[in-house]
Design a protein with these regions (language model features):
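Conserved SAM/SAH cofactor-binding pocket of Class I
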Residues: 56-137, 147
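Class I SAM-dependent transferase core
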Residues: 2-66, 71, 101-118
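Conserved beta-strand signature within the Rossmann-like core of class I S-adenosyl-L-methionine
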Residues: 158-173
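Conserved beta-strand segments of alpha/beta enzyme cores
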Residues: 92, 117-119, 165, 186-189
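Short glycine-rich anion-binding loops that position phosphate/pyrophosphate groups of nucleotides
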Residues: 139-142, 174
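A short, conserved alpha-helix within the catalytic core of class I
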Residues: 143-153
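Active-site capping/gating segments
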Residues: 173-211
């Protein structure tokens, strides 16, 4: 399974609208990637596994509630924010990146698939004035630096099964990197959720901010 069918395989309860939106992403990213490079050229054929399904790993760890607010930092072409926003249409997503061209792509794609629970802005995370329930990201920097940018952007009151904090998609050996932060965290191996080879070294780092 290499197209949108793989999403339905792992998330069997999608609505018709969600299935359509996921199916639209393939052609849209191919089209936009030729104009503005948001995914490496050799990787665009692996879009559904390496980018969309990878983003949705977060949904295997937490179910965002209606009204929840989620910040996606360094979203690039819209990952993990766009796939998560499709999956959780009643939650609110704010996608930010310091590179304007990437935000242009995010806005064009969300408009094309009529995804109305996303705001996208060209801004650095540390300049944001709001607070969110969760911050999500795909490995934009070492966790210690990332934590420094966003630890003041998380609401203290939690209404989810997990305390409010960071959900970070990252690969490789994370122990040394996490030890330098000296905070309590939990790792989830993505092989628990998905069987594709791509996920063998991939993890989610969950870091509650208030403890």
């Amino acid at each position: 399974l290499q197209d949108a069918a793989i999403i339905s395989h792992y998330f069997p309860n999608l609505s018709d609208k969600q299935k359509k939106q996921f199916a639209q992403l393939g052609p849209l990213y191919k089209e936009w990637n030729e104009k503005i490079n948001v995914i490496s050229r050799k990787d665009i054929d692996n879009l559904y596994v390496n980018h969309i399904l990878h983003s949705l790993a977060i949904a295997k760890v937490i179910q965002f509630k209606p009204g929840a607010t989620i910040l996606d930092v360094g979203t690039g072409g819209g990952f993990p924010g766009i796939p998560l926003a499709i999956l959780f249409p009643e939650s609110e997503f704010h996608l930010v990146d310091s590179i304007g061209k990437k935000i242009t792509v995010v806005k064009e794609i969300t408009g094309a698939i009529e995804l109305d629970n996303i705001n996208a802005d060209q801004i650095r995370a540390e300049q944001l004035k709001y607070k969110y329930d969760f911050v999500v990201s795909r490995a934009v920097t070492r966790m210690k630096e990332f934590y420094g940018w966003i630890n003041t952007k998380v609401k203290s009151h939690s209404s989810h099964d997990l305390d409010n904090g960071i959900l970070y998609l990252k690969g490789g050996d994370l122990e040394e990197e996490m030890d330098e932060l000296k905070k309590r965290y939990k790792l989830y191996d993505l092989t628990e959720f998905f069987k594709e080879d791509f996920f063998e070294t991939k993890k989610i780092v969950y870091l509650p901010v208030f403890n």
